[in-house]
């Protein structure tokens, strides 16, 4: 019998059980999905049902909002904003992991916060850096933030990257990181983790639609010199990118490819690897699903799959291939 391997990013953490478990919609626990038997989808060393019972059948306290002082604001170009702010030490530690993100707002209205991936979290200085692409109403509001002023953030959240298990298990291996556009920002914590585990990392960057590679400051600290090239051409993986990927995985025995960009880039890379018959290479990628509450309640991050399955991707940790296979568009 086929059993899908999925995980909940919050399972076993201080935020579990959450509102989903309280309402009978737990991602992992069968009994907290309405069943009368114990059949967890993925055992994490903690019984979520028991934790809920011990907590009076109520969800644990969820993420808090913090008011933080902005230490630096840089407008890299008209639509790219870099913000550095001071955070509590525990929050800085929690946000140092690959895939970490927060919700930011500059307005008192809680409906105006926007999910932003962490570029860097310095646990020595407690300075957190984020890079924001100005696209719509919510992100335009962030242009009003000034150095020395304050911003309100909510976090920590950790499901900004799919395939985290594939990243963590890499040790003394050769890794390829492919990034495009604002995907340059969330790739930095991933590269940092890979370098810490003594992996050799090759980075390909397509700066489009930006004017420059604005994460050079952090790549230099990691002794990473990225190769710049055009990755997408007419909505498809460019011939230049195909040649580079085929050459690098052929000569360097690549064990993991991390894709930091839009879903079209992830999909095209997976399709090309299938064409090369290289399903043996592990994958990880950015989580590009829309998010609003970050707790799986609002439904903004949900997607429907074959078999009438609904997945809440602000919490569901899956492999990059799984987020496209069997996905329904209506």
Regions found by a protein language model. Name each.
Residues 114-119, 310-317, 324:
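Short amphipathic beta-strand/extended segments with alternating polar/hydrophobic composition
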Residues 270, 296-297, 325-326:
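Short acidic, glycine/serine/threonine-rich loops at helix termini
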Residues 55-152:
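Ferredoxin-reductase
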Residues 17-20, 24-41, 287-320:
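Local cysteine-cluster metal-coordination motifs and their immediate loop/turn environment
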Residues 107, 156-157, 306:
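Short, surface-exposed secondary-structure boundary micro-motifs
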Residues 6, 54-74, 314-330:
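Short Fe-S-cluster ligation motifs
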Residues 2-4, 8-62:
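OB/S1-fold single-stranded nucleic-acid-binding modules
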Residues 137-292:
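FNR/FR-type flavoprotein reductase catalytic core
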